[in-house]
Amino acid sequence: MAKFDVVDLDLKKVSEIELSDDVFGTEPNAHLFYEVAKMQQINRRRGTVGVKNTSLVSGGGKKPWKQKGTGRARQGSIRASHWVGGGKAMAPKARDYFYRPPRKVRRGALKSALSLRAQEKTLIILDGFSLDAPKSKQAFEVLTKRLKLQNALVIDDKGNTNLHRSVRNLAKFDVLPPEGLNLEAVLRHSHLVLTSAAAKTLEGALS
């Protein structure tokens, strides 16, 4: 078990928390990052492209002129790919790009990302992050002036609606519930901010 400082919104230590080395203390694995990042990017592809090849373009069934004797190059169809209005050679077709590595790989990538943030000292664990009302200005002041962050991913339970509504409107900050944590979101931000409750939730989910 590794010990982490739990701080308040002014970065003052208020307590300590013990978290599993299996989740927050593993050796970061770059290959797992690659596999899961590839999955997230590939699965965003819609795959709806569709172009007609020679066999799908209407018309062109008749030979435009006889094979020999006209002085012109021989042609078999006015819908060949080199004709205007012809079909596309090797036309792309709609396809499903869905890709999903094994569950062990996906969980391992998240553990590696959390451990990387812990090793780089860019993991902040708060005792709580409550706002009086859903105000983006208030959330921005807390994150930039009190926590001294310019770019961060905040993880807290769904029940904290004021926080979620406040942070989701900020350009360089994102907020997710623990069950929505994903590799791309962690690596895209320079800092990871967890509430102590969210840290325990992640520990339980990934152990």
Curated annotation (Swiss-Prot):
One of its GO terms (cellular component) is ribonucleoprotein complex. The keyword Ribonucleoprotein applies. Keywords: Ribonucleoprotein, Ribosomal protein, RNA-binding, rRNA-binding. The keyword RNA-binding applies. Gene3D superfamilies: 3.40.1370.10. Coiled coil: none annotated. It comes from the Bacteria. Residues 52-76 are annotated as: Disordered. GO terms for biological process: translation. PANTHER family: 50S RIBOSOMAL PROTEIN L4, LARGE RIBOSOMAL SUBUNIT PROTEIN UL4M. Belongs to the universal ribosomal protein uL4 family. Part of the 50S ribosomal subunit. NCBIfam families: rplD_bact. HAMAP family: Ribosomal_uL4_B. This is Large ribosomal subunit protein uL4.
